Regions:
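Short Cys/His-rich Zn2+-coordinating modules
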Residues: 10-22, 35-42
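Short, flexible, mixed-charge glycine/proline-rich loop motifs
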Residues: 20-31, 44-50
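Short cysteine-rich clusters marking metal-coordination/redox-active sites
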Residues: 34-37, 56-59
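Short metal-binding segments enriched for Cys and/or His
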Residues: 60-95
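Long, low-complexity, charged/polar intrinsically disordered regions in eukaryotic proteins
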Residues: 112-191
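Positively charged, polyanion-binding regions of nucleic-acid-associated proteins
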Residues: 183-203, 234
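Short, positively charged loop/turn segments that connect secondary-structure elements
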Residues: 213-229
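Charged low-complexity interaction tracts in eukaryotic proteins
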Residues: 227-253
Length: 253
């Protein structure tokens, strides 16, 4: 995988944002592949496509690309707040590619957040633009990646090191079961994933119960939080994300 942008494409543009859009989209079209099925290359949508930037001709997964000249941060600028919220609740929201690059126009990090990891509480509403702005009153948003469990951060390139394709597709496909869950059930599973992220590789049921107060705040109408924790651990076990060792002991895989 060649991590260098083709800077010759920038000669026809003056706007920094246009240059980065052209260079990053060109790089993804040349070097990117579908994290779901491994198909390469990805195809580009027409420029006026409102939902996504790329799609896979083999499995039809769709991807939107966000690029940034900086280290990978937890807060990512996005577009209109109302549009983003509508997409999260729709059936055709795309997966998100996040790309960071160096001052030398080399890809530092390239990762995907699968669409089934996006929840409303990840989206931060920004203040409306002031009356003096060209788009006065427009409300944008940021994406808070801190809310994404580690399993939902699938790196294709990490610290300028390409990841094996097989590893990428395996991690992506491990969590596809979330797409078949209803919103509330998926929320529980994502919350449990975030809790497990904070535990050591080997943990026990009592360790998981430490999150009971946090989960009670998240789900105040649920009066059986510990039962729910056990249920969610069983789901993660059945999906091959953790291993049950017996006697209330678990191991993260």
């Amino acid at each position: 995988m060649n991590l260098q942008f083709n800077q010759s494409l920038a000669k026809s543009y003056k706007s920094a944002s246009q240059i980065i859009r052209v260079l990053s989209e060109d790089w993804v079209s040349r070097e990117g592949y579908c994290p779901n099925c491994g198909n390469q290359p990805l195809s580009e949508f027409a420029n006026n496509q409102p939902v996504a930037d790329f799609y896979c001709q083999s499995c039809a997964e769709q991807y939107e690309l966000k690029s940034k000249k900086a280290k990978l941060s937890y807060i990512i600028n996005d577009g209109a707040y109302a549009t983003m919220m509508a997409r999260i609740h729709s059936d055709n929201n795309p997966n998100f590619f996040f790309l960071t690059y160096s001052p030398e126009f080399i890809v530092n990090n390239f990762l995907i957040i699968p669409k089934h990891f996006f929840t409303a509480d990840m989206i931060i509403e920004r203040p409306p633009l002031p009356a003096t702005a060209r788009r006065a009153g427009w409300v944008g948003c940021n994406i808070n990646l801190k809310k994404v469990p580690e399993l939902g951060k699938v790196f294709l390139v990490k610290n300028q090191q390409p990841m094996p394709n097989e590893q990428v597709t395996e991690q992506f496909q491990k969590t596809l079961f979330l797409r078949n869950q209803k919103s509330l059930s998926r929320g529980w599973t994502l919350d449990m994933m975030r809790c497990v992220d904070k535990l050591p590789t080997h943990f026990n049921l009592q360790d998981a119960y430490r999150f009971a107060d946090y989960l009670q705040l998240r789900y105040p109408n649920n009066n059986h939080i510990k039962d729910k924790i056990r249920q969610q651990l069983q789901i993660l076990r059945d999906k091959g994300l953790i291993e049950f060792l017996g006697n209330g002991r678990y191991r993260k895989l």
